[in-house]
Amino acid sequence: FGTHIELLEMCELKAYREEVSDGELKRKLDEFYDKFNVEASCSSEELVRAARTSVALDKLVNVHQLGAMAYYYEGFCGNDYENIVTSVIAGNTLLTGYGIPVAGECEVKNAQAMKIMSLLKAGGSFSEFYAMDFKDDIVLLGHYGPAHFAIAEEKVKLVPLPLYHGKPGKGLSIQMSVKPGDVTLLSVCEGRDGVFLLAAEGEAV
């Protein structure tokens, strides 16, 4: 693809996070309430934590002129970096919706596939296969990380998770259902002869 990759540092994101002003924080919280259906169970502390991280992510993207991002980080024993990484989902979802797709699990190829779908105005949201019912020809897919507003059936919900699955900590996450209709799955793959695209078509029901 000729992709230029920047290796980003958590300490840089932390520095931007510490510089967030009260005005920036208020504007980001207003953006949350505009873009998300914020569940009443979301605490003000978690909303502020996620909003502060979202502002920092915006700055990181602008400074490095990022067109997409892939990340993975766990942190350690509740340290500052864990506090950051457990509050990124809301901000990453906003970036994804604004054409800067963000993929978890440090999946660079997935971020590239999301970028292609975004440029085609087809959304682009990381998803994982959960189960396949060959008898009824049904595939179950889902994910609890960042998503894309364009494929949501209703306004995307912002909800609290008391415990993250597969990683430490807790924080805000999003909930959405894919709108019924035609869907396209796209993967960027690499084989013996180089990079290729793998696509599938289906229907969301």
What are these regions (language model features)?
Residues 1-83:
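A charged, amphipathic alpha-helical module
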Residues 49-205:
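Anaerobic metallocofactor- and corrinoid-dependent redox/one-carbon enzyme cores
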